[in-house]
């Protein structure tokens, strides 16, 4: 395929994002031609993806595949807090560091956080958001992850940051959480839930959120008209980078909320263009650190795979084939 041939070194280009953007614009035509001769290959990819469903056991396995590449690897191209989600830019001139801090601030203000709040974070990452919220907004935080690598790093972060004593860190699946919280936040963890588990996820959030509480969900989405087709196949990202991952549908999120919960959407902000800028900075930093990536034991194919992955995602956001949203939910009292 297109991505595989780049990874294998069969072709190269000085502007990979431009090439992938062109491919995205012609995606429907490419898919029609592919259907004529690659049904068996597509079925094999779909079956492989189905084998990576996000059950309790499957979720841990899928998360480990991606995030347990090692913290030293991610330090090479992420900001100092290791935020692995879209930043928030006031202008294209913003640094990655300042844009990630702006994202944390933006989310905290949307949630109206204060010292009176007990916030649940579903998906700790490397602890950057929880550390920021505890230090700057004074709230108590319970945060959970299922990645051992991220858990161990976040523990070290919380032990040294101001307000870290207000943070409780768990190594637990969201389905097993207990208690109730004033606010909930989940930043780009939802892609690891999977469409078949929407009701289970939102039922858990509904149970964990106090009456009159609010929740912010930040997630990557795909065009609504592409969603049904997207679910029926696997793709390059899910095959090589994120097993078990699925982009979200805002429409299906709304249906799940109505079907299974007392939660309702009261605000939505599309920040897809911010993700394109974030990915561009990640990609440039990754390429600048190529020598250090190799020193960690990764080969040339791995380098090209990650270059393609970052360019592929950036192109998708720039063409608005995929996007990123922050959804505010309220729970009826």
How would you label these PLM feature ranges?
Residues 1-78:
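N-terminal auxiliary segments of SAM/dcSAM-dependent transferases
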Residues 115-125:
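Conserved class I S-adenosyl-L-methionine
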Residues 126-137:
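Conserved SAM-binding loop of SAM-dependent methyltransferases across substrates and taxa
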Residues 154-155:
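Conserved SAM-binding loop
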Residues 175-185:
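A short acidic, Gly/Pro-enriched loop at the edge of an enzyme's catalytic core
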Residues 199-211:
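A short glycine-rich, Lys/Arg-flanked "PGG" loop and its adjoining helix->strand segment in the class I
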Residues 212-220:
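Conserved beta-strand signature within the Rossmann-like core of class I S-adenosyl-L-methionine
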Residues 221-333:
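Substrate-binding/catalytic lobe of Class I Rossmann-like enzymes that use SAM or dcSAM, i.e.
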